[in-house]
Curated annotation (Swiss-Prot):
Belongs to the PurH family. The gene is purH. Residues 1-147 form the MGS-like domain. Its EC number is 2.1.2.3, 3.5.4.10. It catalyses: (6R)-10-formyltetrahydrofolate + 5-amino-1-(5-phospho-beta-D-ribosyl)imidazole-4-carboxamide = 5-formamido-1-(5-phospho-D-ribosyl)imidazole-4-carboxamide + (6S)-5,6,7,8-tetrahydrofolate; IMP + H2O = 5-formamido-1-(5-phospho-D-ribosyl)imidazole-4-carboxamide. Pathway: Purine metabolism; IMP biosynthesis via de novo pathway; 5-formamido-1-(5-phospho-D-ribosyl)imidazole-4-carboxamide from 5-amino-1-(5-phospho-D-ribosyl)imidazole-4-carboxamide (10-formyl THF route): step 1/1; Purine metabolism; IMP biosynthesis via de novo pathway; IMP from 5-formamido-1-(5-phospho-D-ribosyl)imidazole-4-carboxamide: step 1/1. The IMP cyclohydrolase activity resides in the N-terminal region. One of its GO terms (molecular function) is IMP cyclohydrolase activity. InterPro entries: AICAR_Tfase_dup_dom_sf, Cytidine_deaminase-like, MGS-like_dom, MGS-like_dom_sf, PurH-like. Pfam families: AICARFT_IMPCHas, MGS. One of its GO terms (biological process) is 'de novo' IMP biosynthetic process. This is Bifunctional purine biosynthesis protein PurH.
Length: 521
């Protein structure tokens, strides 16, 4: 146990600090502080000694040097049980500091502001704060270090239970948190400055640092022989699988999380009406828009009832009673995810205790740029996320698509973006008719889409086709025409585009180029 007799407090985030300081003062703790924190505490009736008075050395260089002094760091690093340390501290008049409460200059918040200049960023790089945190954390058996106001209550409770003392176990956990905090802080600085080594801003600096936090231990990974955990990024607020709230059901598995991510990101593409996406093994097997969520689910399910078994269902509207009842009565489902769920829907789903029900809230219509990461042996592939749909829509055939066909082409194109390559999607009237995924040849994906439609009893005649990448040969067009496809949307860009367009003209099909590919591996 470490008895708290003296604490150094210097915080940029003042939340809860007055109340916490008053508790410390109630235990007779001497409080050292600097600048704005010292003024706030004094104004609130807390007795405070300035760090400059404690060290006998004034603040200098416009406040850049406040706590960088042997009396501060000696007081933090000196080991109480080491006679040599104790003797040396006595020789130089260094007194123990038993607690450090510090959070750092808001560097990330500063650089996130539009128009932030380099000089502003530099002035918000904290030097003394991280140095104190590291000193205190290194000497955790004797020093309590706090970087997060969330932990104030825990320390207050422990001090009350132990007569003003804090356990080494608690101190160790707080020390780990402090090192995590300074690592993330330095990483943010390194990323920001590294991106500005040359002219302009490089999105891929020479080194890249990011920190994730463990959210959940998983029973196993993609397969039972693999161990796994789910980590989430810091300060995430966007509606995503990482920020979903689980209302009921078993713990999410590794595959549940991966598939829910695919389903949720797909359904977020659709805002024009109630939409349902059913995903299996990270591929949409049914997507549909309806006049109601129930109709959207019915239509999505009808695309491929076999593959929907054990799938993930994502909705872009509140899960209502009728839709929840239809899902639970009709199929085995692993996860249902929606912006919200009505109390009646929650009650229905609760009858299936293993079904995981997640809500993700509303999501912004504006796209927030982000990076995607893919691990390869010995390295990491980093790219900007594929967040655009097309460059422009260009009709390249003699026949123009009808207004109805154009709507279906754009619907099917959005679905194809989320299907594993090579991806082919047949669609009509705002629903998928057949999905061909993950084949090594594009024509085979087209054949599978037709087979899926036939097995589901759906009519392909008059439907449209979306392809995530160009057709290298005309065979994909010939195959589509043979089953009744009337219009095609694809990126274009093949050496044989002219041959492919000619094939579409021969069959009286309309074809639209998007100028943008959507490979998904």
């Amino acid at each position: 146990m470490a008895k708290i007799k003296r604490a150094l407090i210097s915080v940029s985030n003042k939340r809860g600090i007055i109340e916490f300081s008053k508790v410390l003062a109630g235990y007779g703790v001497e409080i050292l502080s600097t600048g704005g924190t010292a003024k706030l505490l004094r104004d609130s009736g807390v007795d405070v000694k300035d760090v400059s008075e404690f060290t006998g050395f004034p603040e200098m260089l416009d406040g850049r040097v406040k706590t960088l002094h042997p009396k501060v760091h000696g007081g933090l690093l000196g080991m109480r049980g080491n006679p040599e340390h104790v003797a040396k501290m006595r020789e130089f008049g260094i007194e123990n500091i038993d607690m450090v409460v510090v959070n750092l200059y808001p560097f990330e918040a500063t650089v996130a502001k539009e128009g932030c200049l380099l000089v502003d960023a530099i002035e918000n790089i904290d030097i003394g704060g991280p140095t104190m945190l590291r000193s205190a954390a290194k000497n955790y058996p004797d020093v309590t270090v706090l970087v997060d106001s969330v932990d104030y209550a825990t320390i207050v409770d422990e001090m009350r239970e132990n007569g003003g003392e804090v356990s080494a176990k608690t101190n160790f956990g707080l020390a780990v948190k402090a090192f995590q905090h300074t690592a993330a802080y330095d990483g943010a600085i390194s990323n920001y400055l590294g991106a500005r080594l040359g002219e302009g801003v490089d999105p891929f600096p020479p080194t890249f640092t990011f920190q994730v936090r463990k959210s959940q231990e998983l029973r196993y990974g993609e397969n039972p022989q693999q161990s796994a955990a789910f980590y989430v990024e810091r300060d995430q607020h966007e509606a995503s699988v990482a920020t979903c709230h689980q209302i009921q059901g078993k713990e999410l598995s590794y595959n549940n999380i991966a598939d829910t991510d695919a389903a949720l990101e797909c359904v977020k593409q659709f805002t024009e009406g109630p939409t349902c996406v059913i995903v299996k093994h990270a591929n949409p097997c049914g997507v549909a828009i309806g006049s109601s969520l129930l109709e959207a689910y019915d239509r999505a399910y009808s695309t491929d009832p076999e593959s929907a078994f054990g799938g993930i269902i994502a909705c872009n509207r509140e899960l209502d009673l009728e839709t929840a009842r239809a899902i639970c009565e009709r199929q085995f489902v692993e996860v249902i995810v929606a912006p919200t769920a009505s109390p009646e829907a929650v009650q229905v789903v609760s009858s299936k205790k293993n079904v995981r029900l997640l809500v993700y809230g509303e999501w912004p219509q504006t796209v927030v740029p982000r990076l995607d990461f893919k691990r390869v042996t010995g390295g990491l592939l980093v790219q900007s996320a594929d967040q655009e749909l097309f460059k422009n829509l260009q009709v390249v055939t003699k026949r123009q698509p009808t207004p109805e066909e154009l709507i279906d082409l754009q619907f099917s194109w959005r679905v194809a973006k989320f299907v594993k390559s090579n991806a082919i999607v047949y669609g009509r009237d705002g629903m998928t008719i057949g999905v061909g995924a993950g084949q090594m040849s594009r024509v085979n994906s087209a054949r599978i889409a037709a087979i899926k439609a036939e097995h589901a009893g759906l009519v392909v005649e008059g439907a449209v086709m979306a392809s995530d990448a160009f057709f290298p040969f005309r065979d994909g067009i010939d195959n589509a025409a043979s089953v009744g496809i009337r219009a095609v949307i694809q990126p274009g860009g093949s050496m044989r585009d002219a041959e492919v367009i000619a094939a579409a003209d021969e069959h009286g099909m309309a074809m639209v180029f998007t100028g943008m590919r959507h490979f998904r591996h």
